[in-house]
């Protein structure tokens, strides 16, 4: 008889560094959501996804590798894993068959078993036939399975062991976890290292969900967090700090940077986090320009505002706005907020701005209003006459898409329309239709009517 598992269960992958937790995480989620690298300790935060083996669906947590590390950083990693263990219905405790059982494995298995959670010992990197040596039984788990996360072998055995460990439920009593319906606003938090991105997200959700500290570059992977704000389904995505390309030499940092850039590509809104103590470097402008080129909406947030002297704040803002508006014309009018993530000062305003600019990013303007505006704007400032006395005209336009707002404009000679005239039209449109801070795209089409 098939066992009845009604509620969606939570499974945590736990073990010392480099035993293959992130590889199994990617395997079970059927997507490459975790960075995998030979360097131990790549994962530093709890990472969540939906997992599946056959028809069995569950929530999956990847955790930092645990070591007997007494320093402050190691303790913060341990806190992340402890929270995952507390959340989980079942623990997959992972070890590496190639290295065998190490002292850390024994210490950590004792730590995990203290929580009295259902657990399966997962012996990874078993590419060949495997005999369970008595040393594995010394870890104290009564259920174990040999797998190769990299090659996908042993997944059916893993399924059997997991199902056997989970209690059977009555459908009337089981809690059913339905996905949140409606649009999900995906907000990526990006910026240079140590700008306070993770601290900001922790402050928003009121939970030490992400590892933070004074060390630059703690976050290595994009971490997704589902959240509700004022009835809106929000997916917050923390990303690794982005340094200049020329300063990135290690392969792991290249993977982290690529992961962060990829997150921007699929975002609805990007929060560009800037350190008030190191304001507006060229790299900040490069990130903002990349966001605009990808067609994403953007909100600029200056963090650590509490560390700026009151007497200097007005001059700081004046200079900041000047630089933004002169160097980022493609998102002119972008909202900028000044916060202290550490003190939770003005952090709710950031989400309100994200929701507002998201609506602008989705704005649809009727064709009649567009052409009324176009006629007025081009008559007020027409294009210059060409040779032969013929004037270039833009006679008609329509909106072809949103996200970002994109428009098709029909002209008798589109190749003669200058970039400066396009900027004039775009800036005028921003003011006329209240569209600050979002990329606006114009595509010119040559009209087939010779009399236009």
UniProtKB/Swiss-Prot annotation:
Associates with the 50S ribosomal subunit. The keyword tRNA processing does not apply. GTP 1 binds at residues 15-22, 62-66, 124-127. Signal peptide: none annotated. One of its GO terms (biological process) is ribosome biogenesis. Residues 9-170, 185-362 form the EngA-type G domain. The lineage of its organism: Bacteria, Pseudomonadati, Pseudomonadota, Alphaproteobacteria, Rickettsiales. Residues 363-448 form the KH-like domain. InterPro entries: G_ENGA (IPR031166), GTP-bd (IPR006073), GTPase_Der (IPR016484), KH_dom-like (IPR032859), KH_dom-like_a/b (IPR015946), P-loop_NTPase (IPR027417), Small_GTP-bd (IPR005225). GTPase that plays an essential role in the late steps of ribosome biogenesis. Keywords: GTP-binding, Nucleotide-binding, Repeat, Ribosome biogenesis. SUPFAM superfamilies: P-loop containing nucleoside triphosphate hydrolases. This is GTPase Der.
């Amino acid at each position: 008889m098939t066992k009845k598992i009604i509620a969606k269960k939570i499974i945590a992958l736990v073990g010392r560094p480099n035993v293959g937790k992130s590889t199994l995480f990617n395997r079970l989620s059927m997507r490459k959501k975790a960075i995998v690298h030979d360097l131990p300790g790549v994962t530093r935060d709890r990472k969540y996804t939906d997992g599946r083996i056959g028809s069995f669906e569950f929530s999956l947590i990847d955790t930092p590798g645990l070591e007997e590390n007494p320093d402050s950083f190691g303790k913060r990693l341990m806190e992340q894993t402890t929270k995952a263990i507390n959340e989980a219905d079942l623990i997959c405790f992972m070890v590496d068959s190639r290295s065998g059982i190490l002292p850390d494995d024994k210490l950590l298995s004792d730590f995990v078993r203290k929580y009295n959670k259902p657990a399966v010992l997962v012996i990874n990197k078993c590419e060949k036939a495997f005999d369970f040596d008595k040393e594995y039984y010394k870890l104290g788990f009564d259920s174990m399975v040999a797998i190769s996360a990299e090659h996908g072998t042993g997944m059916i055995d893993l399924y059997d062991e997991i199902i056997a460990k989970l209690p059977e439920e009555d459908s009337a009593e089981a809690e059913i976890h339905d996905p949140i319906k409606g649009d999900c606003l995906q907000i990526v938090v990006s910026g240079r290292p140590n700008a306070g991105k993770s601290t900001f997200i922790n402050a928003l959700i009121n939970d030490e969900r992400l590892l933070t500290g004074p060390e630059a570059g703690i976050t290595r992977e994009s971490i997704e967090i589902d959240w509700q704000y004022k009835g809106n389904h929000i997916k917050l995505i923390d990303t690794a700090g982005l340094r200049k390309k020329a300063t990135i030499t290690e392969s792991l940092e290249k993977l982290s940077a690529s992961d962060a850039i990829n997150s921007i590509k699929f975002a609805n809104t990007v929060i560009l986090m800037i350190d008030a103590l190191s304001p507006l470097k060229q790299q900040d402008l490069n990130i903002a320009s990349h966001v605009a080129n990808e067609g994403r909406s953007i909100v600029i947030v200056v963090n650590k505002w509490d560390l700026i002297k009151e007497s200097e704040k007005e001059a700081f803002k004046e200079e900041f706005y000047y630089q933004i508006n002169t160097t980022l014309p493609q998102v002119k009018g972008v909202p900028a907020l000044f916060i202290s993530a550490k003190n939770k000062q003005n952090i709710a305003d950031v989400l309100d701005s994200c929701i507002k600019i998201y609506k602008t990013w989705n704005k649809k303007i009727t064709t009649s209003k567009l052409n009324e505006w176009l006629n007025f704007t081009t008559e007020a400032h027409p294009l210059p006459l060409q040779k032969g006395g013929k004037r270039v005209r833009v006679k008609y336009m329509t909106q072809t898409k949103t996200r970002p707002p994109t428009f098709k404009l029909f002209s008798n000679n589109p190749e003669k329309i200058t970039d400066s005239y396009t900027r004039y039209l775009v800036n005028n449109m921003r003011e006329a239709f209240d569209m600050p801070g979002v990329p606006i795209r114009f595509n010119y089409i040559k009209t087939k009517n010779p009399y236009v």
